[in-house]
């Protein structure tokens, strides 16, 4: 069966807890091969990480080229005894499809595959009746964890083969409360770092022989984070810097520590680049340290840069398709955390539209069967408009 519900159930029954595949990519590969796609299974490796399988499938050789992206790996089920049905049973109960990945995001992938198969069947097995156009799938098994051997490498692999993409739909659960309420058109960037403050270790009874870094790091945390980084932009909320831990590595209560450190993360908008953001924080630190406090920031490598797909013909056709099927005009949003769209945005404009995310990563993750049907129709509408 190639309807969205059947595909989603088959995918959920593959316990593909990241980074395991457990047969999930095979479900998709079989369906796409049968429809005339050329499929490539690509395995990527990195020292210290698990090897991960990925799938690239394409039909057509000309433009315009639209690609559907997603991930088949899922987070662990947690306490499976707490589930009302088996976490990997793919059971339909009271009009809902239950199972880990039903929302995030095997359900969305199933809808995109079902929509593409229906579209091809209506057009003589081709993306467009005149034989032009291309449709592809970029599917990874490495999104829920480190995201090292997944989409970022699959895109590079495809580019090295001469593949180019005009537009992408990523089927992440973008909607907040109801199907049709939100399209994600961008994401803030993410940058992490650790603040280190030097002190001099010593006995608490002789503070004059030591230098306590704890009061100093407290002052620096306030100096760095108290003033807003900005006040937002036309398409993004304000950037925010949040300290997430403070530690001195000291288990003795009679020893002044020799060093203090604090971890932080910044979510930043298009008022900043990664370089300008780091410079802003470093400037605040230097001013607060003066000539007395010795401190430094160690920045973590980051490939989560800010991006936005600006309103235009592609977002317009997506909004039109969503409004026709759901009766709602979606908000073009840049809220939320990071996704693989941050990698895709370097290759082509990308939007995120999938299911409602309320139960993702929860016990009894589930999606209304009617939402699977509607999302399939939305994707059909996008394809019809795209190749119309």
UniProtKB/Swiss-Prot annotation:
Record family assignment: Belongs to the peptidase M20A family. DapE subfamily.
Cofactor binding: number and manner: Binds 2 Zn(2+) or Co(2+) ions per subunit.
Keyword Acyltransferase assigned: no
Record EC number: 3.5.1.18
Residues that hold Zn(2+) 2 according to the record: 104, 144, 361
Gene Ontology biological-process entries: diaminopimelate biosynthetic process; lysine biosynthetic process via diaminopimelate
NCBIfam families in the cross-refs: dapE_proteo, PRK13009.1
Metabolic or biological pathway, per its Swiss-Prot or TrEMBL entry: Amino-acid biosynthesis; L-lysine biosynthesis via DAP pathway; LL-2,6-diaminopimelate from (S)-tetrahydrodipicolinate (succinylase route): step 3/3
Name listed for the protein in its UniProt record: Succinyl-diaminopimelate desuccinylase
Subunit and interaction comment: Homodimer.
PANTHER family: ACETYLORNITHINE DEACETYLASE (PTHR43808), N-ACETYL-L-CITRULLINE DEACETYLASE (PTHR43808:SF31)
Residues that coordinate or bind Zn(2+) 1: 71, 104, 172
